[in-house]
Amino acid sequence: YMDQVTTFMEEQLSSTKRYEDDKILTKTMINNYAKNNLLPPPNKKKYSKEHLLVLIFVYYFKNLLSIKDIEILLKPLTDKYFAVDSEFDMESIYEEVCKMEKSRIGELQDSIRKAYETAEHSFVCVDDEEREQLQKFAFICNLSFDVYVKKQLIEKMVDELPKPDK
């Protein structure tokens, strides 16, 4: 049921919150996701494991993409792999993506470390007092540029996907 879904998501994803009073998922969000074709309707008000997996994808995507872009990305998957009696389903997709992401953690850590080191070697001609703040700013700019470029690429790729039927 919806209350169980919001509680479960809050418990599982609370470590990703920036502020303690941030909400991971609300009933209104779930209703909006269903209304915007991101989430298939529940079966007699009951949500399945696959609903939770789709909600996890939505949770991560919504920080980068518009609701429309998320629909373009997820609708073909939910149409083809949601609640199917097949070995390959939403859970298979989720597991494969998680495995791929976990395999990249070291690479991402190295990339972040390199961005930090680059920033650490910037503003060497500035007084010590100001240098630390400017280096932190440079580090944030470096990370932001990385996110910006990747977001642009993601949006371009989404724009090239077929638009889902209503």
Where are the language model's segments positioned?
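Basic helix-turn-helix/winged-helix DNA-binding cores
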Residues: 1-81
